Amino acid sequence: MKFCILLLANCKIVCYNKKVMCGMSKKSRAQIIIYKMGVLIMALNNAYLESVYEKVEKRNPGEKEFLQAVYEVLESLIPVVEKRPDLVEAGIIDRIVEPERQIIFRVPWVDDNGKVQVNRGFRVQFNSAIGPYKGGIRLHPSVCASVIKFLGFEQIFKNSLTGLPIGGGKGGSDFDPKGKSDGEVMRFCQSFMTELCKHIGADTDVPAGDIGTGAREIGYMFGQYKRIRNEFTGVLTGKGLSYGGSLARTEATGYGLCYYTSEMIKCMKNETFAGKTVVISGSGNVAIYATQKATE
């Protein structure tokens, strides 16, 4: 396998890539970065976390998005595990990188020409330590198991920061709503929910919108859920106002980003947004409303 190596000062070199390279002496005091399968992997300066990552890599071969997310989180946890050996003893880190449940299912639907199309659906229920799973449903051709696991893994930490009792999960499909008629999107969403409804519920798993899944798609899914389960419960967030949705739901993520950033600036530097240069990536709901709030 081809890879490139970069050496940086003041770190330890470790062995990767099926033991092609051996651990080197501490005298070298360098860190190895291997570009492998599209992911830059840096050696973690903690033997326990290195072993955790190696197990994750072995269980999830080729899943570069998920592996990169796990690596970044493990890297940030180095000072935590050094101060809290009890977390290591209890196997907390080993457990948090492994999903509690992974669901993959077929989604057949009929297009406007009467032809049957088949997509793949996913729901990863990653961690429910503090509450029911919570995370969006992404509809995009790039969706695969690796992407959904990466998003679900990060959702654990995002949700825990809210202070609310909600766990982390994520779902989606490789269906592309772009260029599809309303009827085609509706039939896909109904088929998707016909299977997904077996695995979600107000006290179990509460999906939401994401890329490709707006109020229209959530509405179709919610209608199918009600039809099958005969329940009008809070099983999906992101619904329209006329059937149980929340005010300012569309703007909430972008606004929240600015509020959070404002508090961080205030906490760390005792400053405000005034006079700051703001760089925003993208042009979706988050970027648009973050731009709006930042200019205010």
How would you name each of these model-derived features?
Residues 2-12, 16, 23, 30-38:
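Short, positively charged and aromatic/hydrophobic N-terminal segments
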Residues 278-280:
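Hydrophobic Val/Ile/Leu positions in short beta-strands of Rossmann-like dinucleotide-binding domains
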Residues 287-288:
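N-terminal Rossmann-fold NAD(P) dinucleotide-binding loop
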Residues 294:
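Aromatic pocket-lining residues of Rossmann-like dinucleotide-binding sites
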Residues 140, 159-274:
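Glycine/serine-rich phosphate-binding loop and adjoining beta1-alpha1 elements at the start
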Residues 86-117:
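Structured beta-strand/loop patches that form or line metal/cofactor-binding pockets in enzymes
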Residues 283:
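Glycine-rich Rossmann-fold phosphate-binding loop(s) that bind the pyrophosphate
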